[in-house]
Amino acid sequence: MSAILNVEGITKRFGGLQALTKVTFDLPEGQILGLIGPNGAGKTTLFNVLNGIYSPDEGRVHFRGKDVTGHKPYHLSRMGLARTHQIVRPLNGLTVRENVTAGACFGRENQKLGRAVQIADEVLEFIGLAERAEQLASSLNVAQKKRLEMARALASRPYLLLLDEVLAGLNSSEIDGMIAIVRKIRDQGVTIIMIEHVMKAVMNISDRIIVLDYGQQIAEGTPQQVAADTRVIEAYLGDPKLAERLMKEE
């Protein structure tokens, strides 16, 4: 299985703060990679490097075989890399359909408006928001806005999707619904990296997991391997038996 993303020695500093230190990993196509760690561990900073908001101070990022280190977010979107944000900011004065249409217009396939609207309707059906298409984005609740954020990213037709805490603020039934959507996206061939604090979800949906702590990559492996790693237990999970329980829960 070929790698869609190669991350080599990524280091990022903000003045005297070193937010990331030589983070390195390869991501095979078609997998879900979970990215976990305490608050302030560098997870969102890594996303910001991967999608071009920040340029790394050291290291390289290769996406689909091309060096994209320091490329701008709009360029990476055209190449097929999309992301969601932890704090969703829809275009509140536009309808749900118009929000998703914008994603299609500025994505990988550079769609004309008419086709972009068709793509928006297809994605809204897929994501479960078709009946809300004519509503203003401002009228949606938190769970619906999370889905809209994901729909807007999907409309860009990404090869790689970065999901930043899409489960945050959701209740248990909403979490189950969102997990089902993430699996559907993966089943359509989209590779996913997801930052998440809902351990039950990330342990059961991820093919592999990377753990960051103070910007250091302290573990990488299958959920079972990561759950048994003493460094992860000390830095994040706390309870040695917690991970075992999470792995058994579906």
Where are the model-predicted features located?
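Glycine-rich phosphate-binding loops of nucleotide-dependent enzymes
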Residues: 2-250
